[in-house]
Structures are given as structure tokens and as C-alpha cells.
Design a protein with these regions (language model features):
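Sec/Tat signal peptide C-region and signal peptidase I cleavage site
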Residues: 18-22
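Glycan-processing catalytic domains of CAZymes
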Residues: 23-338
Length: 338
């Protein structure tokens, strides 16, 4: 995500009762909708000139329906069940502004997904990216946001639900927490059973679930780390979660945001390998099974965070989608574990 906070873990926890079944496993990938215009701040000179291997096979721009349909085909064929689209409020800290929201280029890919003729191959949901520049303040604005979702997204047959409730993920959940009850009430008023709310952050009450957006060792600055150290970090954190709390684990494709830094100051991970990523995914499945989690979800960071080094989409440097194919192998692994 272009606006990154040095919050090193966003952990999400689901509360379920019955044993997990392989067919319940759903794997989602976060979709960063920042590549729609030439003026996007995501296109840094450093990214374009020094990291050309990260360019997706369809080019940097993703703002036409043919490319979205191609992404749906590729993702669904390889085991991705849904995209979690980053969604941005307008106006920052101000009153709900539907006109400005609809005009945001950062919602282009979500709009294209809704129009795609092959969207029945995947589900989708919303991650509210309520960070600086897209802050939501006050009960009324949170309620209007959910009302907008109900009118424009929840009614779509492909919207992801759990227990017949639309799934909404909160990037900065503490800001939204006081208004969860009101948001649920708004969803009920719109004809739904309520929301299935997932918070990025551990230990917050009122949410139905929790998950990470991404995670890395933020204490290490300007330091090169081995790829497998990233997985060790993520798995160490989730293993500390109390047994009574059921976790929707994160699997990260990588972290290296040097293309977005004028001065390289954050940790980054090198020596990427498909085998290490596959084992990372397998351990997430094992983790879900060990905690008897139904309706199990694994979240992957990310489908297309090219600037931050977290991407599954096939690129110039991975034209055959070798990392993406590990997701399909994970589905087979889950079936064998059944």
C-alpha cells in the first residue's frame, strides 16, 4: 500500500466453532488499486527504471476491462478465491463525499471487476484503507460508508460473505472500533444480517475477525534479510496468538519497498524462492487445521504491491507465474490433509 505505516503486524483472528474442512479453505489476495493513471504516485522513477522486472506481463497500467478479465482468469485458475480491494474514503477527515469517491482513480480496478464478464470465477471484498489521506471520522461518516457499500458492492452476487454477512476488513481498526455497532445497524437497515468485520490488529473487541495486511521486522532498518527470515517473523507472531483466538493467517510473497524510497531506510528481503513460499503456505494450512478453523481463510500479501515487493501477479521477472502456481499447489495440499 502506497501509504505505509511502520506498524509491523496486522493480525486478524476469526472465531469459529466446528472442525475445518478442506473445501472450506479460501485464499484471498490483497489488490492495490494504484496503477490506473500515469500520474499515480506509485510510478516512481526508481521503480520504472531500476525495477523493470516487477512490471506485470500486461504492462504497468491495469485500467481497462480486458486486463481485469485477464487477471481474473489467471488468479482463479491458480487457486485465488477472492480479491480484497483497497478502498479509499473521500474527503479525508471530512464529510462523506460520494462524488469524490466515485471519481477516485484508486477505485478503477474495483469498478472494472464489477463489470467483468468473467467475475463469476472469483469473489471480492473491501479493505477500508483508512490511513492518512483517507481518514474517516465520526459515526455518521462511517454509517454512510457502509450504506454506500451496501448500495454498490454488497448487492453484487460475487461479494464475499461469512455467515451470510458481507466481509469488510479495516486497515486501521482502532479508528473504526467505536462505530462497529452503528455500522452493523446500517447493514441491517439495508437488508443484511449485519457485517462480518475483520480488523488488522490483535486484541480489539467488537470485531468478528482479525488478519494482517502485511508484516515484517520493522526494527531492522536499512538491512538486507534472507527471504525465509520474513516467514519466520510472520509465523512467530501468529504462534503467540492465544489458542481460543482463531487466526486467518497471512502469507507474504515478499517485502522490499526500495523502489518507493528516495533514501533506502527499511528492511528488505532477498533470495526469493518458490519452494520457501510454498512451505510458508503449507504451514498456514497446517496452522488452520491445528486450530480447528471452519470457513478458513488465508490472506496473501499481495496480488500487485509491486512497489513494496509483495506480488503474485506474473511479471517480467516471473512470466510463468511460478509464485502464483504455489497457491494452486496449496489447495491440493489442503485436500490431501482433509
Amino acid at each position: 500500500m502506497r501509504h505505509f505505516y511502520y506498524i509491523v503486524t496486522f493480525i486478524c483472528t476469526l472465531f469459529f466453532l466446528s472442525p475445518v474442512r478442506a473445501q472450506d479453505l479460501q485464499i484471498g489476495a490483497y489488490y492495490f488499486d494504484g496503477w490506473a493513471t500515469e500520474k499515480s504516485s506509485a510510478y516512481t522513477p526508481k521503480l520504472l527504471n531500476q525495477y523493470q522486472d516487477r512490471m506485470p506481463i500486461w504492462g504497468w497500467r491495469d485500467d481497462n476491462i480486458e486486463i481485469m478479465e485477464r487477471q481474473i482468469d489467471i488468479a482463479s485458475k491458480n487457486g485465488i478465491d477472492f480479491f480484497a480491494f483497497c478502498w479509499y474514503y473521500a474527503d479525508d477527515k471530512g464529510p462523506f463525499n460520494e462524488k469524490a469517491i466515485r471519481a477516485k482513480p484508486a477505485h478503477t480496478s474495483l469498478d472494472l471487476f464489477l463489470k467483468a464478464k468473467n467475475k463469476n470465477k472469483m469473489k471480492f471484498c473491501i479493505l477500508i484503507a483508512n490511513h492518512d489521506g483517507a481518514k474517516i471520522e465520526g459515526e455518521e461518516n462511517w454509517k454512510r460508508t457502509i450504506g454506500y457499500f451496501a448500495d454498490n458492492y454488497f448487492s453484487d452476487s460475487q461479494y464475499l460473505t461469512i455467515d451470510d454477512k458481507p466481509v469488510v476488513i479495516y486497515y486501521l481498526p482502532l479508528d473504526a472500533q467505536p462505530f462497529i455497532s452503528s455500522m452493523n445497524g446500517e447493514a441491517v437497515a439495508k437488508g443484511y444480517k449485519g457485517l462480518y468485520t475483520m480488523s488488522c490488529g490483535y486484541g480489539l473487541k467488537d470485531y468478528d475477525a482479525m488478519t494482517w495486511y502485511n508484516s515484517f521486522d520493522g526494527k531492522k532498518e536499512s538491512e538486507e534479510q534472507d527471504y525465509e527470515d520474513l516467514f519466520t517473523w510472520i509465523e512467530r507472531i501468529r504462534n503467540k496468538i492465544p489458542e481460543k483466538t482463531v487466526v486467518a493467517p497471512l502469507c507474504s510473497v515478499g517485502w522490499d519497498k526500495r523502489p518507493w524510497e528516495n533514501v533506502e531506510k527499511s528492511v528488505y528481503y532477498v533470495n526469493k524462492s518458490t519452494s520457501a513460499f510454498r512451505e510458508h503456505l503449507y504451514r498456514a494450512v497446517d496452522y488452520l487445521y491445528s486450530r480447528n478453523t471452519p470457513n478458513s481463510i488465508i490472506m496473501i500479501y499481495a496480488w500487485n504491491e509491486y512497489g513494496e515487493g509483495g506480488y503474485l501477479a506474473p511479471t517480467v521477472g516471473d512470466k510463468r507465474g511460478k509464485f502464483l502456481k504455489q497457491v494452486k499447489k496449496t489447495k491440493r495440499y489442503a485436500r490431501r490433509k482433509k
